[in-house]
């Protein structure tokens, strides 16, 4: 408060440090007239209590004043808080300025980061140039590989075409003969046998379809893995091409072997055809043995019912499996489309970054497509040749075995014919399975050689085609099932007819037994003929094997010479292509470096221009911010100064008003206390006059007593009456205690002095205490009930309160009146005199009988 310019608060703070000083006024210790009998000290105590109550009331007033002061101090504290808020705002503005500086530093760091980015871009461009060089080198290497492979494949194509023509001719001959054999067999066999063959065919088809489904699932899983491995497989293509060349050479050798085997097979087929003609003649004789099959027909009827139930179950399973295949196809197509979309996005990015390499990539892709098409055609031709050869070989082997068994076991001709039919069907199945396996292998080779996009599209198309074929096959199987159901009905009618024929067969059994005897003789002759034919056939095979081994050796030597010549040509062409492509790559690199240098120079110029513009804008913004900040600081300071001045003026006015009010109240209270003090002083003076009169009376009475008690003249007693009060009291005490040593201590004690002193001297001593050294106007001392003595010192400007003194443990001395002194002296001088006591017991001689103020 004093720092803010409130000098008037000093006096008021001093008032706060003096509790109870506002109403401590000076009073005399003279008792009023009404309480003269109880003593002056009791009255003084009552007045002191009143003063204490007045002090308490004054304290409450001072507390109210203190509360008001606290409120004013709170107002001042609020002003100080406003000052602090203003300082905080200034600090915030400084913080904002620092933040702007940090932003500027951040912009500078961004500019430095842009420079580093430019440097990184230059490095990346250099890296791309190096990658372009590597790609062009790889391109040249692949072109050389493809050229060599194309030449080799063309030569192989020519050879394969020749082989295909020969194989087609052989196929036509074999098919014609097979058709003739099948027609003969179909004519011989009954409808029941046809039903069995169809049943086996349907079972085999179902098994094949199950195998195809499993293979499709495996191929789908493999394709997913292959899509992920395409990038790695592209790098390994050049290694695979070399391996495939070796495989092609191996296939050529196999084709030559097949041609030799084909000639051998043709010779053997001619011989077997002759044998089949003979066997057919024998089979015609055995047509009458059909009655043995009647018992088997009953069993077939039972099997037919079980087959129907199983067929229904299989059809249901096939439908569910077909639905699962469709779902798998949809999922595979969705995944393929997603991967295709991702690959397309990657390709667009790469195309945007490498526009210069698009032309070269397109050329390479076209060449690769052409090579792949050529390769596919070769593989398809080879697969067809393999399939046809395997079919013919298997069929011929099984037929030869069947014929040998027929010739060896003529007794059970019918059962052996059934077994031969089953073996032929199994051979057909195995040949078809081999075909499918070879086709799957060829398709996998084709898929591996194609690019990412072509593989995905080809897989999708193949899956669609396979599903369509499966659907068609399922429809055809359903039609076949309907036909089989119709045939079953027909067979039932036939069975009824056969019941009638059984009776006829029983009659014909006798005739057949006779014919069997004749057939046995014919079989013995046939066995001898077959043994001779086997020997001749073995000799032919050994001779043909020797010729084939010689021919294979010659072919291997020729192939080795051709391969060495092809390698020499390939190396020469490779060196030429590498040199030409190196020149092209160097030219392209020079052009790209010039373009990139120009682009970098342009980017640097633009970045410099942008830096200059941004620096100018930043400097202008900083100037504007500083001007705004200075204007805000000036406005805030002016507002703050005005508020401080207004608050100071208000506080000073309030303090002045309060001080004037307190001074007026204090003056009025002082005047009232002065009036009371004057009245009390007058009363005390009257009491003093009365006490003086009493003392005079007492002195007269004492003189009379001394006259009676001693022989001393009355004049000396009157003179020494005031002086000998203490000596008489000392004598009385010495007589009671019985010692002279205590007399000296009693004369020096303060109690004796108190006895000698009068009431006027006591009042003078009370009005002049020796506690304070500096007294400006007046000091008063009043005794309260608690024994505390509050003192008030009045100065010119301030009033201070002293802490009350603690009550002493000593007993207050009693004032010695003349009667008490006389009693003590009488007891001391005449301790054992009874006559003197009798004098005071009489009413005429007692001087205090009529005195109401005398002490007992």
Curated annotation (Swiss-Prot):
Q: For this chain's UniProt record, which GO biological process terms are given?
A: cell division; homologous chromosome pairing at meiosis; reciprocal meiotic recombination
Source superkingdom: Eukaryota
The residue ranges flagged as biased composition, category Polar residues, are: 719-729
Assign the protein's first listed, main location to one coarse class: nucleus
| Keyword terms of this UniProt record | Cell cycle, Cell division, Coiled coil, Meiosis, Nucleus
Compartmental location: Nucleus
Presence of the UniProt keyword DNA repair in the record:
no
Q: Where is this region: Disordered?
A: 711-743, 826-856
One GO cellular-component annotation of the UniProt record comes to: nucleus
Coiled-coil segments on the chain, per record? 78-193, 332-598, 635-705
Q: Where is the composition biased (Basic and acidic residues)?
A: 731-743
Q: What is known about what this protein does?
A: Required for chromosome synapsis and normal fidelity of crossing over.
Q: Would you tell me the protein name for this molecule?
A: Synaptonemal complex protein 2
Q: Which organism is it from?
A: Arabidopsis thaliana
Phylogenetic lineage: Eukaryota, Viridiplantae, Streptophyta, Embryophyta, Tracheophyta
């Amino acid at each position: 408060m004093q720092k803010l310019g409130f000098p008037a608060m000093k006096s008021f703070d001093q008032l706060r440090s003096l509790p109870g000083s506002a109403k401590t006024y000076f009073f005399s210790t003279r008792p009023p007239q009404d309480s003269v009998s109880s003593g002056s000290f009791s009255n003084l105590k009552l007045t002191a209590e009143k003063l204490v109550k007045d002090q308490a009331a004054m304290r409450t007033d001072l507390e109210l004043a203190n509360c008001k002061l606290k409120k004013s101090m709170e107002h001042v504290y609020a002003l100080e808080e406003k000052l602090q808020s203003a300082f905080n705002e200034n600090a915030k503005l400084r913080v904002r300025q620092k933040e702007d500086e940090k932003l500027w530093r951040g912009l500078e760091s961004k500019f430095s980061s842009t420079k580093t980015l430019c440097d990184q871009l230059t490095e990346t461009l250099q890296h791309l140039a190096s990658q372009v060089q590597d790609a062009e080198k790889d391109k040249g290497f692949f072109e050389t590989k493809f050229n060599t492979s194309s030449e080799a494949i063309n030569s192989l194509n020519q050879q394969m075409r020749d082989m295909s023509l020969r194989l087609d001719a052989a196929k036509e001959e074999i098919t014609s003969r097979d058709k003739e054999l099948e027609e003969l067999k179909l004519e011989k066999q009954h409808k029941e046998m046809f039903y069995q063959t169809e049943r086996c065919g349907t079972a085999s088809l179902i098994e094949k379809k199950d195998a195809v489904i499993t293979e499709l699932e495996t191929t789908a899983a493999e394709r997913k893995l292959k899509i992920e491995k395409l990038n790695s497989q592209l790098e390994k293509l050049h290694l695979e091409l070399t391996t495939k060349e070796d495989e092609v050479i191996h296939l050529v050798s196999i084709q030559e072997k097949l041609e030799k085997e084909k000639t051998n097979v043709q010779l053997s087929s001619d011989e077997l055809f002759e044998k089949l003609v003979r066997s057919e003649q024998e089979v015609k004789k055995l047509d009458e043995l059909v009655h043995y099959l009647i018992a088997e027909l009953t069993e077939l009827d039972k099997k037919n019912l079980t087959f129907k139930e199983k067929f229904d179950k299989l059809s249901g399973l096939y439908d569910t499996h077909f639905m699962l295949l469709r779902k798998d196809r949809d999922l595979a197509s969705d995944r393929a489309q997603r991967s295709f979309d991702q690959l397309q996005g990657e390709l667009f990015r790469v195309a945007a970054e490498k526009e210069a390499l698009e032309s070269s990539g397109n050329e390479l892709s076209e060449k690769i497509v052409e090579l792949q098409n050529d390769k596919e055609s070769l593989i398809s031709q080879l697969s067809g040749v393999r399939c046809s050869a395997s079919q013919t070989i298997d069929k011929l082997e099984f037929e030869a075995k069947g014929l040998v068994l027929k010739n060896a076991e003529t007794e059970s001709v019918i059962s052996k014919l059934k077994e031969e039919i089953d073996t032929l069907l199994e051979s057909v199945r195995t040949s078809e399975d081999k075909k499918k396996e070879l086709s799957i292998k060829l398709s996998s080779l084709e898929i591996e050689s194609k690019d990412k996009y072509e593989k995905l599209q080809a897989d999708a198309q193949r899956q669609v085609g396979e599903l369509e074929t499966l659907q068609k096959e399922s429809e055809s199987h359903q039609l076949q099932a309907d036909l089989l159901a119709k045939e079953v009905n027909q067979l039932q009618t036939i069975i009824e007819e056969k019941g009638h024929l059984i009776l006829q067969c029983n009659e014909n059994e006798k005739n057949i037994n006779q014919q069997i005897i004749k057939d046995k003789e014919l079989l013995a002759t046939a066995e001898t003929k077959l043994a001779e034919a086997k020997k001749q056939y073995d000799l032919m095979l050994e001779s043909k094997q020797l010729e084939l081994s010689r021919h294979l050796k010659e072919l291997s030597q020729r192939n080795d010479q051709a391969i060495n010549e092809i390698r020499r040509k390939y190396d020469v062409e490779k060196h030429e292509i590498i040199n030409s492509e190196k020149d092209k790559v160097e030219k392209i690199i020079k052009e790209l470096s010039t373009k990139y240098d120009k682009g970098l120079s342009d980017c640097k110029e633009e970045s410099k221009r942008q830096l200059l513009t941004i620096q100018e804008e930043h400097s202008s913004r900083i100037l504007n911010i500083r001007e705004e900040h200075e204007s805000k600081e000036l406005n805030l300071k002016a507002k703050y100064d005005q508020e401080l001045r207004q608050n100071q003026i208000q506080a000073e006015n309030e303090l002045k008003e309060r001080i004037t009010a307190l001074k007026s109240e204090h003056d009025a209270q002082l005047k009232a206390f002065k009036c009371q003090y004057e009245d009390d002083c007058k009363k005390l003076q009257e009491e003093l006059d009365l006490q003086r009169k009493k003392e005079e009376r007492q002195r007269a009475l004492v003189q009379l007593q001394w006259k009676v008690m001693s022989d001393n003249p009355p004049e000396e007693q009157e003179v020494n009456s005031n002086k000998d009060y203490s000596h008489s009291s000392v004598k009385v005490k010495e007589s009671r205690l019985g010692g002279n040593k205590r007399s000296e201590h009693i004369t020096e004690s303060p109690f004796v002095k108190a006895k000698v002193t009068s009431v006027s001297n006591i009042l003078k001593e009370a009005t002049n205490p020796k506690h304070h050294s500096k007294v400006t106007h007046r000091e008063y001392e009043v005794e309260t009930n608690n024994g505390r003595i509050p003192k008030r010192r009045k100065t010119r400007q301030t009033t201070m309160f002293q802490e009350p003194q603690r009550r002493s443990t000593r007993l207050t001395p009693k004032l010695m009146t003349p009667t008490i002194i006389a009693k003590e002296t009488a007891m001391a001088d005449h301790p054992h005199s009874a006559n003197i006591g009798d004098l005071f017991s009489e009413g005429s001689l007692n001087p205090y009988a009529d005195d109401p103020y005398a002490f007992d």
